[in-house]
Amino acid sequence: NPFVNIVIMALIIIGGIGFLTWEDIKNNKFHFRKYRMQSKVILSVTVILIVVPAVYFFFFEYFNLPLGERILTSLFQSVTPRTAGFNTTDLSKFSETGQMMTLLLMLTGGAPGSTAGGMKITTVAVLVSSALSVFLRKEKTHFFKRRISDETVKSAATIFLMYIALFIGGGMIISRIENIPLLSSLFETASAIGTVGLSLGVTTGVGIVSQLILIVLMLIGGSPGSTAG
């Protein structure tokens, strides 16, 4: 049902951009230049994280669907992995590239102060901007002509490394214990630490140790100290 899909996507986006961003929108309407730097980053990156995966899904995963359904399904699949975990297709039938794209979206999550999990949009944005600054030989990291403090960059790097270590470590252990493909187990651990809920269908058959690993990852991913504002 297109209407149901659109409503769910709208609610996911509304809940995933954060309360402070909505305060900016309420107070400043559509005057983007008046927004806080964080709101500008969140809204800009959110658009990118919706459009780029949707284009990939449209051309490479859903090419056998009618045009209208293809567009809607591609958009839905690019929106839902970062927070809600609703699913309208069998993810196990995705190509490995499609599964990896979904996995990265689950790890990224939504905005700070939102209902979304993951390492947060701002964490990823700070790290990408910092990497570009190093590549371009700039001394400081900037967003929208404002400097990002070194402390913020360090905090983002710490959270990123923690997420990657837990996600990969948990995935490797589960893959070894359960004798399943590494990508499949990494998908499950990304879903757990991102507090998303999507699955390739392997979680229902894993043993108690693997279940405990996933539970711990969910608890860590849902704790306030595991993300940066």
Language model segments and positions:
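Membrane-proximal intracellular helices of multi-pass ion channels
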Residues: N1-A228
